[in-house]
Each structure stands twice: as structure tokens, then as C-alpha cells.
């Protein structure tokens, strides 16, 4: 039996489908997902401030070049190369849109660490 979690999405772009998106699809593999006005976890983005009305774990996502404000969110997924321990995951928008098979690594709790194996130089 899967653990039940209550979630909601606010402040995303116009047309965002909160019941059918990559986040929910990943979560449904491990959890029984329930949408609630009183969620345990709120996912929010850069298109509003409604997330401030919630008293729960706040998870920020943006595909824009905006650094997450960890004074406002508990966890974040964004574009920038920053190190904030287990509270931050770099997820560029192109990964979300075009490389969905890589989600298996998120579901498996493992994210491959890329190693520098070659050198590339560009001369003009």
C-alpha cells in the first residue's frame, strides 16, 4: 500500500494542468496522490504569490533563470548551478520537456553524477 500525500499546485503558468504533469506522474509511482486545498506539500512557480497563503512544505519550481529564495521555500528545482544540499535539485526546463525518460533516476532516488571525461576548446 502506497503512502498517501496531499498536494496542490499554485502560481504556475496559464494552462498548467495540475492533475497531469511530470511532477504528479513521478509522485504517483510511489505515493497515493490526493489534491487538496489543505495540502501537505504545495508546488509553486514564479507567476504569483498565492503560495504564501499555505502553511505546509513549499516546493518551488521554475524554468526561468531565477535563483530560488530559500527564505520562502523549503525545497526548489530550478535552472541554476547552485549547491544547497538536499534542498535543491537542478532541473533545467529542457530536461522536463524533452528528457522525460531520465525521470527514472529521480524515482529511483539516484541522480547520476557526470564526470569530466574530455576537454573541449573553441577557437575563433
What kind of feature is each model-predicted range?
Residues 38-124:
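Catalytic core of nucleotide-activated saccharide and alditol-phosphate transferases
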Residues 1-54, 69:
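N-terminal pre-catalytic "stem/leader" segment of glycosyltransferase-like enzymes
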Amino acid at each position: 500500500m502506497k503512502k498517501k500525500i496531499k498536494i496542490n499546485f499554485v502560481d504556475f503558468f496559464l494552462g498548467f494542468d495540475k492533475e497531469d504533469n511530470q511532477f504528479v506522474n513521478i509522485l504517483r509511482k510511489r505515493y497515493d496522490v490526493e489534491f487538496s486545498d489543505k495540502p501537505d506539500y504545495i508546488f509553486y512557480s514564479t507567476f504569483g504569490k498565492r503560495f504564501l497563503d499555505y502553511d505546509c512544505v513549499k516546493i518551488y519550481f521554475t524554468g526561468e533563470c531565477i535563483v530560488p529564495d530559500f527564505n520562502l521555500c523549503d525545497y526548489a528545482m530550478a535552472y541554476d548551478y547552485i549547491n544547497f544540499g538536499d534542498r535543491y535539485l537542478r532541473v533545467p526546463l529542457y530536461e522536463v520537456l524533452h528528457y522525460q525518460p531520465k525521470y527514472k533516476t529521480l524515482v529511483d532516488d539516484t541522480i547520476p553524477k557526470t564526470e569530466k571525461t574530455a576537454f573541449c576548446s573553441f577557437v575563433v
